[in-house]
From Swiss-Prot:
Assembly and interaction partners: Heterotetramer of two alpha chains and two beta chains.
Limits of the Globin domain: 2-142
Domain of life from the UniProt record: Eukaryota
The keyword Metal-binding appears for this protein: yes
An example molecular function term from Gene Ontology annotations: peroxidase activity
Residues noted as binding heme b in the record, renumbered to the chain: H59, H88
Biological process, per Gene Ontology: hydrogen peroxide catabolic process
InterPro entries to which the protein is assigned, alphabetical: Globin (IPR000971), Globin-like_sf (IPR009050), Globin/Proto (IPR012292), Hemoglobin_b (IPR002337), Hemoglobin_oxygen_transport (IPR050056)
The gene coding this protein: HBB
Gene3D superfamilies given in the database record: Globins
Keyword DNA damage appears in the UniProt entry: no
Name of this protein: Hemoglobin subunit beta
Biological role stated in the UniProt entry: Involved in oxygen transport from the lung to the various peripheral tissues.
Length: 142
């Protein structure tokens, strides 16, 4: 993936201006509300699917860690996601379409958090970043 300097700057702006943990936890809650079948992958949550629940907070932390890796290696994400992709495929049996659903929910929450700063240009750059992450997570499925 080729990134322009402007795209990287826009992704950086999103990353540095948001409370990652809060936004990802809200995105997970949105995922569970809008796509309730995704809860089947989270049996250990024991029915606790709200952003404030400790189970969601813990998983949000894992998602934030993965996004941080992607952000820090924006020019070469795939090699850094090999093990995570493999885990989701071989151990967790997660349908890779769900990565896209979470990415979409995250984009909605970022738009809500950034309001007017979430311009069409920012949205396009973040969407590109999300697609790179989703592709890297889905690599083990190919």
């Amino acid at each position: 993936v080729h990134w322009t300097g402007e795209e990287k700057a826009l992704v950086n702006a999103v990353w540095t201006k948001t409370d990652h943990q809060a936004v990802v936890a809200k995105a997970l809650e949105r995922l569970f509300v809008v796509y309730p079948w995704t809860k089947t992958y989270f049996v250990k949550f024991n029915g606790k699917f709200h952003a404030s629940d400790s189970t969601v907070q813990t998983h949000a932390g894992k998602v934030v860690s993965a996004l941080t890796v992607a952000y820090n290696h924006i020019d070469d994400v795939k090699p850094h996601f090999v093990e995570l992709s493999k885990k989701h495929y071989e151990e967790l049996h997660v349908d890779p379409e769900n990565f896209k659903l979470l990415a979409n929910c995250l984009e909605v929450e970022l738009g809500h958090a950034l309001h007017k700063e979430f311009t069409p240009e920012v949205q396009a750059a973040w969407s590109k970043f999300s697609n790179v992450v989703v592709d890297a997570l889905s690599k083990g499925y190919h």
